[in-house]
Each structure stands twice: as C-alpha cells, then as structure tokens.
Design a protein with these regions (language model features):
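A contiguous strand-loop segment
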Residues: 28-145, 166-291, 296
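Feature responds to low-complexity, polar/acidic, surface-exposed segments characteristic
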Residues: 490-504, 511-591, 597-627, 640-652, ...
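Bacterial N-terminal signal peptides that target proteins for export
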Residues: 2-11
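Histidine-centered catalytic/metal-binding microenvironments
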Residues: 430-492, 510
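Bacterial N-terminal signal peptides
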Residues: 12-20
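Sec/Tat signal peptide C-region and signal peptidase I cleavage site
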Residues: 23-27
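Glycine-rich, aromatic-lined ligand/substrate-binding cores of catalytic
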Residues: 246-361
Length: 667
C-alpha cells in the first residue's frame, strides 16, 4: 500500500505542491504458494499491508445489493470514477476507517476479502516502474488505484480470471494512477498481475508447483505473451518498452517483464524481504542475498519440506530469523547501518495481514478461508474468516479513527507497541501466548469446517449463520486475549518508547517501579517532569520509609498527594534549593536537579569530591548555589551537557532524561 500521489510525482504529472509532501514508507509483502507445494493441497496467497499505522483497520460485511446498478464509485483522492453496471454481490472486506482525518487519503481501501461467487481478492503490493517507461506511458492522474479497485472487483467479479479481466478492462478505459501488484483466487485457479504504467500490465495464471515472495518491486521474468489461456496482457506492452528503449528478453526469447519495466536495481528494503522470505519457505535455497535478480516463480529445493498453513502464516512474522542481519523497522537506523540493519517482513509497521487458503473439499462459491490479523501479526493471533460471513464483532468493525479501547485494531496494535518497547523481555513470552491460541484454533478448525460444509450443502443461509457465529467467537477471544496482554504488558513497557534514545533506562525504571507511565499505555518520555515527580522517583530509589514522613514539613506541600511524604522527606533532609519553595507541581530545572542529586548522594554517604574541572560554555548562566554540585556530578559522569558543550542550567528536565540519570545512579 502506498500514497498514489507519489506515483504521479514520479511520472512527472504532479504539481509542485505535491513535491513538498512527506510520503510515508510503504513496504507491503506478498506471498503465493502453489497447491502442489502445500501439505494439504491448499492454494495459498496473501499479503501484509504496511503504511501509516494511524489508519484504523476493520472487518466489514456488505450484503448483496448494497451497491445498486448505476451507483457511482468516486475515489476522492484522485477523481477516479466507476459506474456499477449491476447490483453488487455479497462480500466482506478489510477497509480503513471511514472517519479518517482530513490530512489523510480518504479512499475506501477495501484491501482484501471474499465475495459470494467464491472469489478472493487482495489489492495491492505497490511497485515503482522505471523512469524511462513512465515517460513513454505516464500514469493517469484520475486512473484506477488500490484505494478503489478492491471495491468494484469484490462487488462484481465471478471468477479469479474474471476479476483480472475486469481490472484490465478498467485500466484500458481509464488508465492506472500507480504501479501495483495484485492476486486473485477462486476454487480453480489463482492469478497474479503486475500493473506497470498508465496502461500497461501483465497477468499470469499462477502455476501450482511454484512459490513466490514479492515485496515492492516487479518480479515477473519471461512471459509467453501469446499464451492466451494463461496470460492476460495489455496490447501495447511490447511497444511501450521498445519506445522507452528498455525492452529485454530472456535467454529463451520471452519478454522479460521486470527487466523491461522495472527499475535497474532492486530496492534494499525489497531485497531483504524477498531473500528472507524465500529462505523461510525453502530453507535449502541457494539464492544469495546479493543476487542480481530474484525469480518470481521458485521451486522447492531438494530436502525442503512442503509448506503448511502455519508455516505460511509465520512468514509474515519473519524478522530475518537465523541470518547475519539485524531487523530494523526504523528507516533512519537502517540508513545509519546499511550493511547490518535490514527491513524485515514481520514489522511493527504492518497495519493488517491477510492470507487466503483455497481448500480442497470447500464449496465452489465459498472455496476457502481468509486468515486475518487487524494490526501486525507479530503479536496478534491469526483468525480464520469464513467466506460467507454476515457480520463481524463490534470490536472488529469499530470505525474510530483514533485509539479506542474497544477497537480490535487499536488494542492489538498497542500490544505490538508495548512488546516493541521492551522486545528483549516481552517478545518470546508474548509470541508463545499468541501461538498457543493459534494452536487451539487449528485443533478446533477441522470439526468446525466439517459442520459448516455439511450445513452449506443443505442450507447456505444457515451455514452463513453458523460461520458468522464461529468467526465472531474467535474474534472476541482474540480481542479478550489482546486486552489481557495489554493490561499485563503495560506494567513493564509503554507504547511510545519504540526507537526512543532512552528506551532501555526507561524500561529499567518502570520494571523497578521507580517511574510509572502517564497513562496505561504511554510514558510520555519527552514531557517535562515536575519537582514532586522527581523527588518521588529519588525517594523510591532510596527506599524511603514514607510512614516516617507523614507530617507536612512546608506550607506549600499539599497533603494526600502521591508526592506528599517524599516532599516532606526532601524538605527535612535539605534536598531542595531555597529557590524551589517546595512547590511540587513546578517543572524542575537541570541545575536544581543537580543540587538535589548532590544533596541526596551526600545524604547516603557518597564521596562528593571532584577530581577535575569540567568547563561548560554557558557556565556563567549556572547559579552559584548549583555550580559545585554540577561539577561533582559531571566528574562522576552522572550528568553531561545538552549539546555544543552547554549545560543549559535553566532548561527543564524531561522524563527520559530523568530515567537516564536514575539508571546511572542505580549502578
């Protein structure tokens, strides 16, 4: 998934206003496993959706006829329109919130789902063509893109091939506004399609004996464009590439699609994902990390085992497992460490993931399951969604555009954040909780499937009621599990610590109960800290017996507050400078903190002598009463300057800075 405006920018069609827009990183990853390579004969295909994590994800059902013949679909992002030629089929999808902020793309982004004709669809894994082919066939400003295509395809497609043909016809008539990869499946076949430029595309019927991992680049190699049964292709696919002087052929004389339309080099974020995904599914693969090209269609190597659904689901949790690389979800961190830090498939930035499993023995109009997580599957269980459901839980369809404690997406995403804030301590145990639940579902599923298939053969309406009830039961169980994890993990981590410079000392302070969050989920590391908060933290570090300090020691100390006894302790032991007036709710300055820390260390018998003079460029701004204390603490390397050799004595302390200082004191 990605911002379609970026595609127009690359094509040279965007205005200068768009040039200044910040475009979020996109990193969707697709998977296909042919039925000959799976343990049970299932055909598997799906993707992760990675983009802006503040976009609420939902599971929504649409009854037959919800969209009427003649209704107009309008993509408010770019003006694309589609007139529905008939009433819509029944379908379900996984769209964004319909209440998104004005500064966010307002498209529907139905993303993935099944319809009642038995067609499973996901849209899209985005990709960039080369500049040369875009000049030859630019994107169309109001052309079709991922924000709208899933809606009309699920509403009307009656087969996987029919979905490809409908999308191809739409591109022929209206053009495309971005580069995309899509996959559609039904009981008989799975189709894979690459959309390259404004009017050029190629789709293939996916072979049953291959597997693929496809991040955000083009991967199709040689394609026989004359094979009408297995290939659907735009009419000018050869001419445009030749016009752009990028046309390439394979050794056996077939048009090389990625070579002709893709960029000259694979993006590093794609390289790390395709390589790790191939080696995950095929442990005996010899494909090197630095390969010039990665094939779309892969064989299982000799000695590698067939793939079951659990294995396929876990690919979307792969964090470069067993490799020499360090997984990193942070673009700046990867840029600073390009040789060691790589973008993994399993990422905190995944908004949702879906894997279709076309299964043997299922009805033609309901040919398989869609396994789903709303939020990243790293720490959220996969749930199987039956294709004929009538509804989802209130939590799963919660439309809130911001955090809501009753939202499946937001609660699960907060658990992912909490784990990422303290992955070393929480990652393994949380994952076990999640996979234990998935094991439970896997054990229940065969009997549920048997009952549902029997019902479906007799009464489709009752079968839909049954599958809806069971799916909602699992959704509710997952929501309750995630709520429990949220409550448990928030005691030892917070959701706003990911990639923060003080993450480790903050986690240490939380685990030792020296500091607490500003809410159940937030630590607010960059907020200023008050005098009362700082003294309370210091008192906890010193294991102060608060019962001894119940008597109020200063008229400015308010009784009955969390800090009352600790402030009394500080006043009695002269830990506060006179300038503070014992006002607990004022923000504390860096020089006052130095005075208080030095007084505390003297109180517990620490050596307060200094060995050398530490010079700060702004030392004239330091108050006389704090100068020696700052020297003492700088000598002990408990305190340092802020930047440019300045101490910034009058600046306020942040909660993160306090955690860092406390971690040094506690050693």
């Amino acid at each position: 998934m990605k911002n379609s405006k970026k595609r127009l920018l690359i094509a040279g069609l965007a205005s200068s206003m768009v040039l200044s827009m910040a475009v979020p990183t996109f990193a969707c990853t697709g998977i296909i496993v042919g039925k000959d390579l799976t343990t049970d004969g299932s055909f598997i295909f799906g993707r992760t959706e990675d983009y802006q994590r503040n976009r609420t994800m939902r599971l929504v059902t649409h009854p037959r006829g919800e969209i009427k013949k003649g209704d107009k679909l309008v993509d408010v992002n770019n003006g694309f329109t589609y007139i529905h030629k008939e009433d819509s089929l029944k379908f379900f999808s996984t769209p964004d919130s319909s209440k998104k902020p004005k500064d966010m793309e307002q498209g529907v982004y139905d993303a993935a789902g099944y319809n009642e004709a038995g067609v499973g669809i996901f849209c899209t894994v985005s990709a960039d063509p080369s500049d040369e082919v875009l000049k030859a066939d630019p994107f169309v400003k109001d052309g079709v893109n991922e924000a709208s295509m899933t809606t009309f395809l699920l509403a009307h497609a009656r087969s996987a091939r029919g979905a490809i043909e409908l999308l191809a016809q739409t591109i022929d008539e209206k053009g495309a506004s971005m580069g995309d990869i899509v996959a559609f499946g039904d009981q008989d076949e799975v189709w894979y399609m690459e959309i390259y430029t404004g009017h050029q595309y190629v789709a293939i019927k996916y072979p049953a004996d291959k597997f693929s991992i496809f991040p955000n680049d083009y991967w199709l190699g040689g394609v026989d464009l004359t094979d009408k049964e297995n290939v659907i292709v735009s009419k000018d696919i050869v001419e445009v590439a030749k016009k752009a002087k990028t046309y390439k052929e394979t050794a056996d004389g077939l048009m090389d699609m990625a070579g002709s339309y893709g960029p000259k080099e694979i993006a590093e974020t794609s390289r790390s994902r395709v390589w790790s995904g191939i080696h995950d599914l095929d442990p005996n693969s010899k494909v090197p990390y630095d390969a010039e090209r990665f094939d779309l269609l892969n064989d299982l190597s000799e000695g590698s085992e067939k793939i079951d659904i659990t294995h396929a689901l876990n690919v979307f949790r792969n964090r470069l497992d067993g490799s020499e690389f360090t997984p990193s979800d942070n673009k700046a961190e990867r840029k600073a460490n390009p040789k060691t830090h790589k973008r993994p498939i399993g990422s905190i930035n995944t908004m949702q993931a879906h894997i279709f499993q076309i299964k043997e023995g299922y009805p033609k109009e309901a040919p398989g399951l869609m396994w789903m997580t709303l939020g990243s599957p790293l720490n959220i269980p996969w749930v199987p969604i039956f294709p004929d459901i009538n509804d989802s839980t209130p939590e799963a369809k919660n439309n809130s555009p911001v955090y809501d404690p009753n939202s499946y997406y937001w609660v699960g995403s907060s658990v992912n954040d909490l784990v990422s804030g303290n992955r070393e301590a929480l990652g393994e145990s949380t994952r076990k909780t999640v996979t234990d639940f998935e094991d439970k579902i896997m054990k229940e599923l065969p009997q549920v499937e048997k009952e549902w298939i029997e019902l479906y053969s007799k009464d489709k309406a009752k079968a839909a009621e049954f599958s809806t009830a069971k799916t909602m039961e699992w959704e509710k169980e997952v929501f309750d599990l995630e709520k429990g994890l949220q409550k448990e993990l928030s005691q030892v981590s917070k959701a706003d610590l990911i990639d923060h410079w003080a993450r480790k000392p903050i986690i240490d302070a939380i685990s030792k109960k020296l500091m607490v969050g500003t809410s159940d989920l937030k630590f607010s590391p960059n907020e200023k800290i008050t005098r009362g908060e700082f003294i309370t933290i210091l008192g906890r570090l010193g294991k102060v017996d608060t019962k001894k300090y119940a008597e109020v020691k200063d008229k400015n100390i308010e009784a009955g507050k969390f800090y009352t006894e600790y402030m009394n302790w500080a006043v009695e032991n002269k830990l506060l400078p006179k300038t503070s007036k014992a006002l607990a709710n004022e923000n504390i300055t860096r020089e006052e903190m130095a005075y208080t820390l030095a007084a505390y260390l003297k109180l517990i018998g620490d050596d307060t002598s200094t060995q050398k003079l530490v010079v700060f460029d702004d030392e004239k701004e330091i108050s006389d009463w704090a100068y020696e204390d700052i020297q003492f603490l700088a000598n002990k390397e408990i305190l340092s300057g802020t930047s440019n050799n300045k101490f910034s004595p009058k600046a306020n302390l942040t909660r993160a800075e306090v955690a860092q200082i406390i971690s040094k004191l506690d050693k």
